Amino acid sequence: MFAVYANSMSQTDPMSGLVIGDRPEPEVPEGWTTVTVKAASINHHDVWSLRGVGLRQESLPMILGCDAAGFDEDGNEVIVHAVISDPDWVGDEALDPRRSLLSERYQGTFAERVAVP
């Protein structure tokens, strides 16, 4: 599928690691669903990721993008929330010490489809 992703990171030239091309369809963990992305926005988080902040080398290639709007598998319009908490966490996911954002541990929203909880 068509995607925009980080293939490498650079403190001095972050955009050099940005690639536009094909990536595999998202792997969908049990209990998650797939969203067909219709709109996504670039955030400063994406630039920091290309600089190597919050993104580990062993996670590359990583589809960037934290938020999106689109359609779920049933055709419902949805807005994708970027914060992913631990499955065992109860309460505000922003307070979960094991939380992450899409495009840190899980492939992000700059693609035709994204897997989300």
Regions found by a protein language model. Name each.
Residues 97-98:
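Extracellular C-terminal loop/segment signatures of secreted glycoproteins
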Residues 1-4, 33:
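Short structural boundary motif marking the start of a folded domain
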Residues 22-24, 115:
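Generic structural detector for well-ordered beta-strands
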Residues 3-7, 78:
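A short beta-strand micro-motif
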Residues 10-20, 44-46:
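Short N-terminal binding/cap micro-motifs at the start of the first secondary-structure element
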Residues 109-117:
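Glycine- and charge-enriched low-complexity intrinsically disordered segments
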Residues 24-41, 53-91, 102-109:
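Glycine-rich beta-strand-centered segment in the early N-terminal region that forms part
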